[in-house]
C-alpha cells in the first residue's frame, strides 16, 4: 500500500465536458462530489451518495486499498487553490503558480502550512548531456505549449470567458 497518489484537476476545455454531457460551470461541484465518493469507496464500506451531480447506490470497490491514496488537486485560480487546501491532501502546482495562495488557504481552512503538500509540476531534463536531450524533446515541449495556447481564451476582456469559480 501507499504507492499510489491520485492527482486530479477540474478541467478547462469545453470538449472535455461535452463528451460526458456535463456543464463546464459545474466543475467545482463535480470534483468535490467525485473526491468524496472516491474517499468513501476506498474505506471498504458500500457507498450510497446523493449529490447535486452524482447519484451512487451500493458502490463497492475491490480490492480495498490498505491505505487510501492521497488526493492531490490542481488549479491556478484562487477558488481552485482554496479547494485544494480544503478537501485535498495536497496541491498540484504548475510552474510555481499559487504556492503562496495555497499556504494562506491552508491557514484560512484551519490547517497549518506543515499539513500542506505542494507537488510542483515543471519540465526537468535529467541526462548525461542535457543540451543534446533538450534538442530531442524540444519539438514535443513546443507542441504541448502551442496546444495550451490554442485551447486558451482570447479576446477583449468583456468577450473572453472567465471561470471565477474554478
Put a short name on every predicted segment.
Residues 1-166:
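Active-site-adjacent structural elements that line small-molecule/cofactor binding pockets in enzymes
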Amino acid at each position: 500500500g501507499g504507492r499510489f497518489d491520485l492527482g486530479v484537476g477540474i478541467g478547462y476545455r469545453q470538449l472535455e465536458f461535452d463528451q460526458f454531457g456535463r456543464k463546464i460551470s459545474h466543475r467545482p461541484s463535480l470534483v468535490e462530489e467525485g473526491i468524496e465518493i472516491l474517499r468513501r469507496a476506498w474505506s471498504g464500506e458500500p457507498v450510497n451518495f446523493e449529490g447535486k451531480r452524482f447519484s451512487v447506490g451500493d458502490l463497492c470497490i475491490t480490492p480495498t486499498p490498505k491505505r487510501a491514496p492521497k488526493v492531490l488537486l490542481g488549479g491556478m485560480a484562487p477558488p481552485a487553490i482554496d479547494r485544494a487546501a480544503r478537501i485535498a491532501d495536497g496541491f498540484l502546482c504548475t510552474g510555481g503558480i499559487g504556492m503562496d495562495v495555497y499556504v494562506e488557504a491552508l491557514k484560512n481552512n484551519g490547517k497549518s502550512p506543515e499539513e500542506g503538500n505542494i507537488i510542483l509540476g515543471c519540465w526537468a531534463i535529467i541526462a548525461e548531456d542535457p543540451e543534446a536531450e533538450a534538442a530531442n524533446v524540444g519539438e514535443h515541449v513546443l507542441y504541448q505549449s502551442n496546444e495550451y495556447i490554442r485551447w486558451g481564451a482570447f479576446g477583449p476582456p468583456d468577450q473572453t470567458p472567465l471561470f471565477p469559480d474554478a
